[in-house]
């Protein structure tokens, strides 16, 4: 018997607004092919592993001391990386880092959201946005995307003007549908905002065919924050490092809400080592894009409806019963993601042999799992 197991969550004085909520989480199952969390399937190079090992070892010698509270060296390295990637001249004062981009988003809502304030998102999109809004007691508003899951900019502009949210979430490329938002559309959204901050979630930005929204920060310094992560293209999911790019005043706001010494010295050392090997790691992006296009074509030829993607995943359907189909993929040793969109499932782009396994399973399932209206096409 586990100590204390006689009580349940209902017995605790939980906040009323959290009762009935479900925690975020993708299934963590031991199966031959895992394509459900949008990780980079290519492991770090031996040179990177050696560099991380050496760097963490050096940091470990100082574990009796607190880490650099503001992670200045890491933020400087992130600025250098983005200078090269975006062509925008950034400095350490433009960067903030935390334990994954979810902590970055939480800190943003702690600073700019909260009771009496609201945030809007265009759904379906990243499911952590409303969860973080709930956790910070920020009122969550939402508007629908277009039928193809793309962002309907005209509708978004109208919703922003009518509802006047304090925060606007835009994900580019969008998770789970994969479409990127062009800079001209971002400008329209920003121009529609009389006040408030647009949080541009670029977790999959390295895969995108569109320029980064970082290019617009100087034009909209009070309105735009760009959130990014090292968990996806950077193959650093286990390292848990997210960051944001914004005007220096936004970084000052982060200092007001961050917990002291929130980034361990080991995390900072490992992330800096990973950044030193950025070129080698990100060489896998082109391979993953080619595989994405191959998988999309293969699924289309089988008769599936494939949502065009600008990321390292594909949303596809239409299934008569998506949860049941998800289980049938799992029965064949392929773990993909049921993201809660009726009729659709999402697959990460993995290694070539993993993608082959997905296509093989799809070929077996196509005759029985597609919705009747689509199966007749």
UniProtKB/Swiss-Prot annotation:
Record's keyword annotation contains RNA-binding: no
Principal EC category: transferase
Annotated metabolic or biological route of this protein: Amino-acid biosynthesis; L-histidine biosynthesis; L-histidine from 5-phospho-alpha-D-ribose 1-diphosphate: step 7/9
GO biological process: L-histidine biosynthetic process
CDD domains: AAT_like
Keywords: Amino-acid biosynthesis, Aminotransferase, Histidine biosynthesis, Pyridoxal phosphate, Transferase
PANTHER family assigned to the protein according to its UniProt record, in alphabetical order: HISTIDINOL-PHOSPHATE AMINOTRANSFERASE, HISTIDINOL-PHOSPHATE AMINOTRANSFERASE-RELATED
Subunit structure: Homodimer.
Family: Belongs to the class-II pyridoxal-phosphate-dependent aminotransferase family. Histidinol-phosphate aminotransferase subfamily.
Name the UniProt record assigns to this protein: Histidinol-phosphate aminotransferase
């Amino acid at each position: 018997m586990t100590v204390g197991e006689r009580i349940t969550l209902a017995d605790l004085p939980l906040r009323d607004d959290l009762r009935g909520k479900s925690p975020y989480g993708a299934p963590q199952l031991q199966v031959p092919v895992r394509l459900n969390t949008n990780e980079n399937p290519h492991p770090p190079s031996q040179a990177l592993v050696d560099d991380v090992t050496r760097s963490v070892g050096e940091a470990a010698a100082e574990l009796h001391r607190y880490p650099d509270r503001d992670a200045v060296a890491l933020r400087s390295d992130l600025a250098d990386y983005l200078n090269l990637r975006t062509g925008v001249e950034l400095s350490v004062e433009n960067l903030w880092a935390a334990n994954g981009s979810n902590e970055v988003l939480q800190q943003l809502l702690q600073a700019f959201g909260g009771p009496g304030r609201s945030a809007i998102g265009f759904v379906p999109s990243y499911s952590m946005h409303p969860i973080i809004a709930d956790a910070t007691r920020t009122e969550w508003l939402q508007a629908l995307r277009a039928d193809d899951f793309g962002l309907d900019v005209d509708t978004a502009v109208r919703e922003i003007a009518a509802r006047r949210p304090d925060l606007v979430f835009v994900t580019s490329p969008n998770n789970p549908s994969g479409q990127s938002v062009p800079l001209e559309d971002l400008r329209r959204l920003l121009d529609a905002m009389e006040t408030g901050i647009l949080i541009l979630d670029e977790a999959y930005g390295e895969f995108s065919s569109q320029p980064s929204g970082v290019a617009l920060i100087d034009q909209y310094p009070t309105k735009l924050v760009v959130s990014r992560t090292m968990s996806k293209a950077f193959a650093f999911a286990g390292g848990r490092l997210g960051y944001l790019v914004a005007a220096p005043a936004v970084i000052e706001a982060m200092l007001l809400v961050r917990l002291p010494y929130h980034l361990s010295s080991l995390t900072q050392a490992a992330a800096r080592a990973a950044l030193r090997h950025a070129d080698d790691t990100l060489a896998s992006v082109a391979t993953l894009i080619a595989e994405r296009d191959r998988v999309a074509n293969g699924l289309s030829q089988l008769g599936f409806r494939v949502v065009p993607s600008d990321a390292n995943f594909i949303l596809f359907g239409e299934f008569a019963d998506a949860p049941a189909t998800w289980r049938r993929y799992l029965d064949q040793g392929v773990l993909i993601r049921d993201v809660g969109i009726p009729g659709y499932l999402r697959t990460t782009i993995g290694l070539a042999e993993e993608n082959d396994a997905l296509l093989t399973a799809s070929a077996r399932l196509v005759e029985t799992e597609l919705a009747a209206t689509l199966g007749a096409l």
